[in-house]
């Protein structure tokens, strides 16, 4: 089962000139045009594969690990990732619209919307059997929705070519309007729902979009929009497919030797070959890093996991071992990155592909996996119901893999207290704090500035003396009586007395 990208057609133009009385007639062989491109199932498959190629683009595409990719765009806004390269404006959030780093994903991906629209229109005109057309059209509709959702979450609603006539016969003077968020949402949910209904749970060729992959993007949209009930129902639909499962070993999820495992829902496939692989480790490794497998690997010493984030991992968390704080150099020396002043650990979640040579690794880039479905469901349940055993059970499914054990929610909380305060302008706010302490011995107190009235001009102070065996849930919310047309915000700060 080789990579989809390898199936791309290479078009060679052979021109034969034949001498005739008074004229020369050119004959073009092997040229794909609108008259012969979508006439067979193989044509439809090739057209679909060409769109999958846009995910990777010779290993430097929008869904891999390169500059401006969705990976970098997502991680730069967190405290989980940094780079040693001179991306000062990008890392500090002070970029402008002239910065290629922040608009690279858009420039790569936005044209794919038009390509998908064109392909769908041509497939609909194809003489191929309807059932065959429906399957390929569903894949392309899903891909178009994938592209559009990721553009939407990174850039907001953007003008897109969704009209077949404009995709087939583009008008240089045509200017598509900027849709509203609601219009984007209607388009995404309609397209993903239709695609999911038409796609199989498992494709004959690994790497193609499945029912579960389409549903997962639908779930991501609902989570992004905080549509908790829709998210819960979609998560349950994915779970109900009875197809996906968690890998027992976290590291094996991303291993090049464990492709196609049942935790993976959608990936960008790769081979350890130039243009067909991923430079997963090349962005990370120092130049003198020695592969534990003896193969020659290159490193550009850029991506890092900041020490502040690395130190949040419990020493018993098995995932911590995938971020290397020290390594063996090609000279055989042990290099301590923290001691040497490096900005962070090596985030080698994807590991080193033992078959890799130079830059290119064969690890598939994981875009969606089943663990996210379980955590999304846990979050949706908590948003709908508050702290509940169902959410804890789902989280424990993940924790047990990392720690070998989970945590529990007592049947009867030993402590429950709430504080109701009247906001100004008839806005009601409710503060509640729940302590689940299985060992006892903890205490807490709170006070509110300005005569104990919680409003938009003061603060709530909570002090907790911890027994070390409990966990807390804190909720801050506004009731339906909030004034319409106004914006509210709540900032929560926590600190440990030992840090003060």
Residue positions per predicted region:
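Secreted extracellular polysaccharide-interacting domains
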Residues: 463-484
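Conserved, well-structured interaction surfaces
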Residues: 45, 53-54, 59, 82-155, ...
């Amino acid at each position: 089962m080789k990579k989809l990208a390898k199936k791309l057609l290479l078009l060679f133009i052979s021109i034969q000139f034949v001498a005739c009385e008074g004229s020369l007639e050119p004959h073009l062989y092997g040229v794909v045009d609108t008259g012969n491109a979508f006439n067979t199932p193989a044509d439809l498959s090739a057209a679909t594969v060409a769109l999958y190629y846009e995910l990777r683009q010779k290993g430097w595409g929008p869904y891999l690990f390169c500059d401006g990719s969705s990976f970098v765009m997502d991680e730069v806004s967190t405290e989980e990732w940094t780079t040693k390269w001179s991306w000062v404006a990008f890392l500090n959030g002070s970029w402008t619209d002239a910065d290629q780093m922040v608009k690279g994903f858009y420039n790569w991906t936005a044209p794919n919307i038009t390509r998908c629209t064109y392909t769908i229109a041509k497939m609909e005109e194809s003489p191929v059997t309807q059932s065959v057309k429906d399957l390929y059209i569903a894949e392309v509709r899903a891909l178009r929705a994938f592209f559009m959702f990721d553009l939407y979450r990174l850039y907001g609603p953007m003008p897109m070519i969704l009209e077949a006539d404009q995709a087939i016969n583009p008008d240089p003077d045509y200017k598509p309007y900027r849709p509203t968020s609601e219009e984007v949402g209607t388009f995404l949910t309609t397209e993903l729902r239709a695609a999911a209904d038409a796609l199989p749970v498992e494709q004959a060729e690994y790497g193609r979009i499945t029912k579960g992959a389409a549903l997962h993007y639908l779930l991501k949209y609902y989570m992004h929009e905080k549509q908790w009930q829709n998210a819960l129902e979609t998560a349950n639909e994915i779970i109900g497919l009875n197809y996906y499962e968690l890998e027992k070993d976290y590291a094996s999820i991303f291993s090049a030797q464990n492709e196609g495992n049942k935790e993976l829902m959608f990936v960008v496939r790769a081979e350890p070959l130039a243009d067909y692989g991923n430079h997963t480790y090349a962005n990370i490794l120092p130049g003198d890093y020695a592969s534990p497998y003896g193969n020659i690997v290159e490193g550009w010493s850029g991506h890092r996991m900041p020490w502040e984030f690395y130190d949040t991992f419990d020493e018993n968390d098995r995932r911590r071992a995938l971020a290397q704080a020290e390594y063996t150099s090609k000279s055989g020396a042990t290099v301590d990155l923290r001691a040497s002043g490096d900005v962070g650990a090596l985030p080698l979640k994807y590991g080193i592909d033992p078959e890799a040579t130079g830059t290119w690794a064969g690890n598939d880039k994981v875009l969606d996996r089943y663990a996210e479905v379980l955590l999304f469901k846990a979050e949706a349940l908590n948003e709908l119901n508050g702290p509940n055993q169902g959410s804890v059970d789902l989280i424990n499914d993940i924790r047990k893999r990392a720690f070998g054990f989970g945590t529990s929610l007592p049947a009867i909380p030993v402590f429950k207290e709430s504080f109701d305060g009247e906001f100004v302008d008839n806005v009601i706010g409710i503060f509640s704090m729940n302590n689940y302490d299985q060992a006892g011995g903890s205490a807490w107190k709170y006070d509110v500035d300005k005569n104990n009235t919680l409003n938009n001009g003061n603060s709530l102070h909570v002090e907790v003396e911890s027994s070390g065996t409990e966990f807390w849930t804190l909720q801050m919310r506004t009731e339906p009586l909030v004034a319409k047309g106004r914006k509210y915000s709540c900032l929560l700060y926590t600190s440990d007395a030992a840090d003060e």
